[in-house]
Amino acid sequence: MAQPAHVPKFGNWDGENISYTTYFETVHRDKGDGSKIFNPNDPEENPQAFYPRTVAQDHQHSEKHHNDTSTDYHVVKQHRRKHHRREDREFHRYVEAPRPHRSPFQGVDMDSHRSRNHGTSATMSSSVKRNSDNWLPQHQHHRRTNKDLAEGKSWLFTTTTASSYTKSRKLSRECSSTTQSSISAKNLVPGDETRSPISWRVFQSYLTKLKEQKQIAATKIGQHLNLR
């Protein structure tokens, strides 16, 4: 079996010769106090290990970009100067050019044209106003006519409804009187038909008359419903 590693006591570390304690003591021997430890796995401390381009190439690229930008700026500036100079020359040429002479007859023609236009506009406004004045009474008359027609229709509907209601009540009263007569006729039936043949004939004729009255009332109701 392998022997376990010898672990020194806490107080005997300086006296005994232990390999790992010696290694830890000599790690920072070459570095002075306060120096920063270099970490090769940090991209900020070791950018060349993580990016393909070197620092020198980045510096050259930035200088080239600056030179190209300055060159473009000068080209654009020269182009704008040429453009402004051309505009200034055209403006001076326009100011110094002679003005065309206008005869007094042209002014008279313009004044007459303006007066004709003013007269035409005044005539159109007066005609529009006259047409609007004529349209207003016609519109009011049309509104009154529509109102009268509406009132006439409502009166006719009310009258027709009232007459229909009166006829219905009259027919219902006739039917109720006929029913009451039939009820009173039942009270006239004798107890023995063989003992009073005369009264039975009278009762039979009375029943026939009641049937006729019922038929007449039913006919009137049917005619009234058909008329509605």
Curated annotation (Swiss-Prot):
<feature type="compositionally biased region" description="Basic and acidic residues">
    <location>
        <begin position="56"/>
        <end position="75"/>
    </location>
</feature>
<feature type="region of interest" description="Disordered">
    <location>
        <begin position="99"/>
        <end position="133"/>
    </location>
</feature>
<feature type="compositionally biased region" description="Basic residues">
    <location>
        <begin position="76"/>
        <end position="86"/>
    </location>
</feature>
<feature type="compositionally biased region" description="Polar residues">
    <location>
        <begin position="118"/>
        <end position="133"/>
    </location>
</feature>
<protein>
    <recommendedName>
        <fullName>NOI-like protein</fullName>
    </recommendedName>
</protein>
<feature type="region of interest" description="Disordered">
    <location>
        <begin position="56"/>
        <end position="87"/>
    </location>
</feature>
<comment type="similarity">
    <text>Belongs to the RIN4 family.</text>
</comment>
